[in-house]
Protein backbone atom coordinates (compact mmCIF):
# COMPACT_ATOMS: atom_id res chain seq x y z
CA UNK A 1 0.00 0.00 0.00
CA UNK A 2 1.51 3.31 -1.07
CA UNK A 3 0.25 6.00 1.31
CA UNK A 4 1.91 8.79 -0.70
CA UNK A 5 -0.10 7.89 -3.80
CA UNK A 6 -3.35 7.88 -1.81
CA UNK A 7 -2.49 11.26 -0.29
CA UNK A 8 -1.78 12.68 -3.78
CA UNK A 9 -4.95 11.20 -5.27
CA UNK A 10 -7.14 12.89 -2.65
CA UNK A 11 -5.04 16.04 -2.28
CA UNK A 12 -8.01 18.28 -3.10
CA UNK A 13 -10.23 16.75 -0.38
CA UNK A 14 -10.60 17.98 3.22
CA UNK A 15 -8.16 16.42 5.69
CA UNK A 16 -10.90 14.45 7.48
CA UNK A 17 -11.87 12.83 4.19
CA UNK A 18 -8.23 12.07 3.35
CA UNK A 19 -7.60 10.30 6.65
CA UNK A 20 -10.71 8.15 6.10
CA UNK A 21 -9.42 7.27 2.61
CA UNK A 22 -6.10 6.15 4.13
CA UNK A 23 -7.77 4.08 6.84
CA UNK A 24 -10.16 2.56 4.29
CA UNK A 25 -7.37 1.66 1.88
CA UNK A 26 -5.59 -0.26 4.63
CA UNK A 27 -8.77 -2.02 5.74
CA UNK A 28 -9.78 -2.89 2.17
CA UNK A 29 -6.50 -4.74 1.55
CA UNK A 30 -6.91 -6.85 4.70
CA UNK A 31 -10.64 -7.37 4.14
CA UNK A 32 -10.04 -8.69 0.62
CA UNK A 33 -7.72 -11.35 2.07
CA UNK A 34 -10.10 -12.14 4.97
CA UNK A 35 -13.63 -11.74 3.55
CA UNK A 36 -15.45 -13.41 6.47
CA UNK A 37 -13.79 -11.21 9.09
CA UNK A 38 -14.60 -7.76 10.38
CA UNK A 39 -11.59 -5.52 9.77
CA UNK A 40 -10.91 -2.24 11.55
CA UNK A 41 -8.74 0.24 9.67
CA UNK A 42 -7.33 3.37 11.26
CA UNK A 43 -4.93 6.15 10.41
CA UNK A 44 -3.73 9.52 11.64
CA UNK A 45 -2.56 12.58 9.79
CA UNK A 46 -0.60 15.42 11.37
CA UNK A 47 -1.15 18.82 9.74
CA UNK A 48 0.62 22.09 10.48
CA UNK A 49 -0.97 24.92 8.52
CA UNK A 50 -1.67 23.25 5.18
CA UNK A 51 1.34 20.92 5.35
CA UNK A 52 0.92 17.22 6.05
CA UNK A 53 3.84 16.03 8.16
CA UNK A 54 5.08 12.60 7.19
CA UNK A 55 6.56 10.18 9.72
CA UNK A 56 10.12 11.15 10.56
CA UNK A 57 11.71 7.77 9.94
CA UNK A 58 14.98 8.80 11.59
CA UNK A 59 16.49 10.91 14.36
CA UNK A 60 17.48 13.89 12.18
CA UNK A 61 14.01 14.27 10.66
CA UNK A 62 12.43 13.86 14.11
CA UNK A 63 14.44 16.84 15.39
CA UNK A 64 13.32 18.91 12.38
CA UNK A 65 9.64 18.03 12.80
CA UNK A 66 9.52 18.66 16.55
CA UNK A 67 11.49 21.90 16.13
CA UNK A 68 8.91 23.04 13.59
CA UNK A 69 5.98 22.14 15.90
CA UNK A 70 7.61 23.67 18.99
CA UNK A 71 5.47 26.51 20.38
CA UNK A 72 2.83 26.10 17.67
CA UNK A 73 -0.67 24.69 17.30
CA UNK A 74 -1.21 21.89 14.81
CA UNK A 75 -3.95 19.38 14.04
CA UNK A 76 -4.13 15.60 14.29
CA UNK A 77 -6.80 14.02 12.12
CA UNK A 78 -7.82 10.50 13.09
CA UNK A 79 -9.90 8.21 10.92
CA UNK A 80 -11.33 4.77 11.60
CA UNK A 81 -13.48 2.42 9.54
CA UNK A 82 -14.96 -1.08 9.66
CA UNK A 83 -14.94 -3.38 6.63
CA UNK A 84 -16.61 -6.74 6.11
CA UNK A 85 -16.38 -8.86 2.99
CA UNK A 86 -14.55 -6.09 1.14
CA UNK A 87 -17.22 -3.48 1.89
CA UNK A 88 -17.04 -0.45 4.15
CA UNK A 89 -19.73 -0.68 6.86
CA UNK A 90 -18.85 2.43 8.85
CA UNK A 91 -16.28 5.21 9.01
CA UNK A 92 -15.58 8.20 11.22
CA UNK A 93 -12.99 10.97 11.39
CA UNK A 94 -12.20 13.60 13.98
CA UNK A 95 -9.76 16.43 14.51
CA UNK A 96 -7.79 17.52 17.56
CA UNK A 97 -5.89 20.80 17.84
CA UNK A 98 -2.73 20.54 19.91
CA UNK A 99 -0.49 23.35 21.12
CA UNK A 100 3.05 22.30 21.91
CA UNK A 101 5.18 23.96 24.57
CA UNK A 102 8.12 25.97 23.28
CA UNK A 103 10.85 23.32 23.47
CA UNK A 104 14.61 23.74 23.57
CA UNK A 105 16.82 21.61 21.33
CA UNK A 106 17.94 19.73 24.45
CA UNK A 107 14.32 18.93 25.38
CA UNK A 108 13.58 17.77 21.84
CA UNK A 109 16.63 15.52 21.71
CA UNK A 110 15.93 14.11 25.17
CA UNK A 111 12.32 13.35 24.23
CA UNK A 112 13.30 11.64 20.98
CA UNK A 113 15.82 9.46 22.82
CA UNK A 114 13.14 8.53 25.37
CA UNK A 115 10.21 7.65 23.06
CA UNK A 116 11.86 7.04 19.66
CA UNK A 117 8.75 8.32 17.82
CA UNK A 118 10.14 7.81 14.30
CA UNK A 119 7.02 6.04 12.95
CA UNK A 120 4.45 8.28 14.65
CA UNK A 121 2.21 10.94 13.17
CA UNK A 122 3.65 14.28 14.29
CA UNK A 123 6.73 12.53 15.63
CA UNK A 124 5.44 12.10 19.18
CA UNK A 125 3.77 9.39 21.22
CA UNK A 126 0.97 11.24 22.99
CA UNK A 127 0.03 8.06 24.85
CA UNK A 128 3.53 7.90 26.35
CA UNK A 129 5.96 10.67 27.32
CA UNK A 130 4.78 12.78 24.38
CA UNK A 131 1.82 14.05 26.41
CA UNK A 132 4.32 16.20 28.34
CA UNK A 133 5.20 18.14 25.18
CA UNK A 134 1.82 19.86 25.11
CA UNK A 135 0.45 23.02 26.63
CA UNK A 136 -3.10 22.55 25.33
CA UNK A 137 -5.19 19.91 23.54
CA UNK A 138 -8.62 20.72 22.11
CA UNK A 139 -10.97 18.08 20.74
CA UNK A 140 -14.66 18.09 19.85
CA UNK A 141 -16.12 14.60 19.64
CA UNK A 142 -19.49 14.10 17.97
CA UNK A 143 -21.64 11.61 19.85
CA UNK A 144 -24.84 11.01 17.88
CA UNK A 145 -26.38 14.50 17.78
CA UNK A 146 -24.45 15.95 20.71
CA UNK A 147 -20.99 17.46 20.92
CA UNK A 148 -18.63 16.62 23.73
CA UNK A 149 -15.86 19.13 24.32
CA UNK A 150 -12.64 17.70 25.72
CA UNK A 151 -9.88 19.98 26.96
CA UNK A 152 -6.56 18.83 28.29
Predicted regions located by residue number:
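Structural motif
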Residues: 37-38, 74-75, 79-81
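GST superfamily/GST-like fold recognition
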Residues: 72, 95-152
Amino acid sequence: LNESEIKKKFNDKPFKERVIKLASAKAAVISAKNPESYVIGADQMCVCGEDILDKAGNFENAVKILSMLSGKTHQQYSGVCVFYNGESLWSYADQASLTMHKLSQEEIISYIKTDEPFQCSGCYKFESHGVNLFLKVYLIVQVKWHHLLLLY
